[in-house]
Amino acid sequence: MPKLTALIRTRNDAARIGRVLESLRPCDEFLIIDDDSSDDTIRVAREYGARVGLAGAEDRNHAELAQNDWILCVSPAEALTEALEAALFEWKQIEHGAARSFRVGIREETRKGWNSLPPVTRLVNRRRVGIGDGMPAEDPSGHLLDGDLLRFCL
């Protein structure tokens, strides 16, 4: 059964990091890569059991710090829907062999409601797909998971 690490790049996200971490129940590890926050982002993340690494000046594949090969990349402004959470629990029950990546839909908050955006690559095997600046390279061949990521913009 595959294990899953959530990778979240942060900077001064103390007010919203809790929401995304609470939605990541299918993940076995939370890895926060912090970019010099001056607020309580690191303290809040650690309260949720997250491991914290620092972004630093050099380019680096921060996925190397993860304990697992499968990485779910999310933003602090996002959260999993219940449908995506259920899909990830189901996903963890299956071995994925040569799979490289999986895609998810995005629903973005606007002043007029929620907009559906095209699916993006967010769940990747770090040994097969590169992750730069906290997000994976787009892989249109990845299978689409049920559910969406909610992106909170307001």
Question: Residue locations for each model-derived region?
Answer:
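A short acidic, amphipathic alpha-helical/loop segment
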Residues: 19-23, 44, 61, 86-87
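A conserved acidic beta->alpha catalytic loop
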Residues: 23, 34-46
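Short beta-strand/loop segment that forms part of the nucleotide-sugar
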Residues: 8-9, 27-37
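Catalytic-site signature of metal-activated, phosphate-bearing donor transferases
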Residues: 59-64, 68-74, 78-154
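Conserved donor nucleotide-binding strand/loop of the catalytic core
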Residues: 42-65
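N-proximal low-complexity "stem/linker" segments adjacent to membrane-targeting elements
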Residues: 1-23
